[in-house]
């Protein structure tokens, strides 16, 4: 929850996918329930991240407990860990694009739908932003506008 003076602006949606490396090719070709996949090692971001909180809630909403075997410090570490065969991992679709195209990883089809997430700009309306903060917000909004242009 945000303080009453805080403003949030949805910048762009993104979809995450569950990926696996070649060691888990036997998981291709069908849809899996989360419960069925709990026997396989899971790579997730650390418990102090919003991504962990998001997946913790996702698992709880499906009557499961999130129990990662490996915690990565950043999202860009998940794809190499998955490629190395250390487990399955959730990443934004665009993070896995190159590894998917190269055949190093594949998408695991889930029966449950992973909710869409959003990149959000949060600003304190009770404070006047300095020049750097104003420019950063302008650049973010401009970048998103350009990406969403036809």
Predicted regions span which residues?
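A late-sequence structural motif
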Residues: 108-149
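Alpha-helical segments flanking ligand/cofactor-binding loops in enzyme cores
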Residues: 9, 35, 79-80, 97, ...
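Thr-Gly-centered strand-to-loop micro-motif
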Residues: 21, 45-46, 68, 91
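Hydrophobic hinge/microswitch elements
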Residues: 53-108
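Acidic, Gly/Pro-rich loop/turn segments at junctions of secondary structure
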Residues: 1-40, 47, 114
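Short secondary-structure boundary segments
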Residues: 1, 22-23, 48, 93-95, ...
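Secondary-structure junction motif
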Residues: 26, 41-62, 129-131, 137, ...
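Generic preference for hydrophobic
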Residues: 18-19, 42, 107, 121
């Amino acid at each position: 929850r945000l303080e009453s003076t805080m403003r949030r602006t949805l910048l762009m949606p993104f979809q995450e996918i569950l990926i696996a490396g070649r060691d888990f090719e036997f998981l291709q070709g069908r849809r899996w329930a989360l419960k069925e996949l709990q026997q396989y090692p899971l790579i997730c971001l650390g418990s102090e991240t919003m991504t962990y909180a998001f997946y913790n809630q996702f698992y709880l909403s499906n009557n499961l407990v999130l129990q990662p075997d490996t915690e990565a410090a950043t999202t860009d570490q998940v794809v190499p860990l998955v490629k190395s065969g250390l487990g399955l991992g959730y990443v934004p679709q665009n993070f896995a694009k190159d590894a998917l195209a190269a055949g190093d990883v594949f998408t695991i089809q889930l029966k449950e739908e992973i909710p869409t997430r959003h990149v959000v700009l949060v600003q304190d309306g009770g404070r006047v932003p300095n020049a750097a903060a104003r420019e950063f917000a302008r650049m973010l909004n401009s970048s998103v506008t350009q990406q969403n242009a036809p």
